[in-house]
Amino acid sequence: MKVVSLRRIYSSEIYKLPTTRLHMDTLYYYYFVSHLAAALFVDLPITEWLGGSLSCLSGLRRFYLSTYEDPILLIPAPWKTALFSSELFFQVPFFIWVSLRLRKKARDPVLWVAILIYGVHAFTTTWCCMFELFAEKKWMIMSFYFPYLAIPLWMAIDMGGRLVKSCHAAKSGPSSTITSKSD
């Protein structure tokens, strides 16, 4: 059985990230940074959880809710609580980690798998929210949510493509990166 060290492939000249991928990574970086801000200042009621001690941070959230009356944030439901807890405990730490990695222009398959997982997760959860907004005819709010639907979908497709391409590169790479291993 042939085993390929993917880390050696990425650190070698076999796999070079095309310029368009670097531009996409820059877009993803800004997406994650902006989504971190949106999560902390709009989506999550952090100031309410802290007892209103940071009321200056809740101004944007109050403005958004009073202006647009977003039913996803205003009307409680158990499934929404699950999504918000996911955002707090999974997405917020992930946004910080992935932003730092993308800023360093990391070419790491672990990063790509993580972004792929995030993309699928964010797309499916936002898809559910979009259906509720559609049912309530909240077109303006749907336009706010749309980038959080489209960009994660594109991320998932892009990262899946990168992983497939890297597997093909690893499979057809030089024999110096392939070692034989008996079963």
Swiss-Prot record:
It is found in: Endoplasmic reticulum membrane. Residues 24-156 form the EXPERA domain. Residues 1-25, 103-110, 160-183 are cytoplasmic. The chain crosses the membrane at residues 26-46, 82-102, 111-131, 139-159. GO terms for cellular component: endoplasmic reticulum; endoplasmic reticulum membrane. InterPro entries: EXPERA (IPR033118), Sigma-2_receptor-like (IPR051987), Sigma2_recept (IPR016964). One of its GO terms (biological process) is protein targeting to mitochondrion. Keywords: Endoplasmic reticulum, Membrane, Transmembrane, Transmembrane helix. Belongs to the TMEM97/sigma-2 receptor family. PANTHER family: SIGMA INTRACELLULAR RECEPTOR 2 (PTHR31204:SF1). Part of an import route for newly synthesized mitochondrial proteins termed the ER-SURF pathway (ER surface-mediated protein targeting), which retrieves mitochondrial precursor proteins from the ER surface and reroutes them to mitochondria for efficient mitochondrial import. Acts as a quality control factor in the ER, promoting the proteolytic degradation of nonproductive and extramitochondrial precursor proteins in the ER membrane thus removing them from the ER surface. This is Efficient mitochondria targeting-associated protein 19. It comes from Schizosaccharomyces pombe (strain 972 / ATCC 24843) (Fission yeast).
